[in-house]
Amino acid sequence: MQEALLKCVHEVLSATAGTKAEGVYFIGMTVKGSVVHRKIDVVVDADSGVRIDQCAFLSRRLRERLEEDEEMIGILGDNFDLVVGSPGLGEPIILDRQYGRHVGRLLRVSYSDLEGVEHELTGHLLEVSLAEGAGSIMLKPRVEKKKGKGEELENITLELGAVLRAVPEAEI
């Protein structure tokens, strides 16, 4: 079922050239429930962030595609919920290309060093390099302010291969 659904999602996304959803790409999908009532959540993004009208457009197109396919109706049943949305705040970055739209924002990053020891830091994403096979990110670590003047920390560059998890954070 997952493969057939993924195929439909990718068909709809590949047919968006020249539409309001052009540039939107697939992040992930979850399917819950039984044939009596299924819920399909499709997560998409765009390099400049996905808008609600793009999600609505893709939701309509995907629903039409699923409902016209007898095989999919047999798999999903007649009663299914379909939600197309963007990754919310606090959701981890899944694809390398998502880093670009978070430049200047605060990220919480878990990474492993050369010895395999896991570390975590929070900082502003300054730069992203998506070179083939050797991408990296540069972060300015956030200093917790205490009485007096806090120490200034050096920028840190991490290879994307060392990043275990990166999550955009809200700044207050």
Curated annotation (Swiss-Prot):
Q: What are its GO biological-process terms?
A: ribosomal small subunit biogenesis
UniProt keyword Cytoplasm present: yes
* GO CC terms in record: cytoplasm
Tell me where it resides: Cytoplasm
Q: Which InterPro entries match?
A: Ribosome_maturation_RimP, RimP_N, RimP_N_sf
Keywords, ordered alphabetically: Cytoplasm, Ribosome biogenesis
Write the signal peptide boundaries.
none
The keyword Cytoplasm is annotated on this UniProt entry: yes
Pfam families named among the record's database cross-references: RimP_N (PF02576)
What is this protein for, i.e. what is its function? Required for maturation of 30S ribosomal subunits.
The record's similarity note reads:
Belongs to the RimP family.
Full protein name: Ribosome maturation factor RimP
Gene name, please?
Answer: rimP
